[in-house]
Amino acid sequence: MSELFSVPYFIENLKQHIEMNQSEDKIHAMNSYYRSVVSTLVQDQLTKNAVVLKRIQHLDEAYNKVKRGESK
């Protein structure tokens, strides 16, 4: 298992979300996951801003890698 909130973690979860939502377009499934995670991170009052920013950066990097078809 990848380190929590790392790029590999988000890549793994994006791919799982796509697989679980095969009836949807790949980009639509990715966008759904992305919005859900960002919303959760933004609402987390216990996490410092720098930590939230780093998590969102990792999510964004993972999103772009999965979209381009990269695996790591």
Swiss-Prot record:
Superkingdom per UniProt: Bacteria
Name of the protein: Uncharacterized protein YvfG
Name of the gene: yvfG
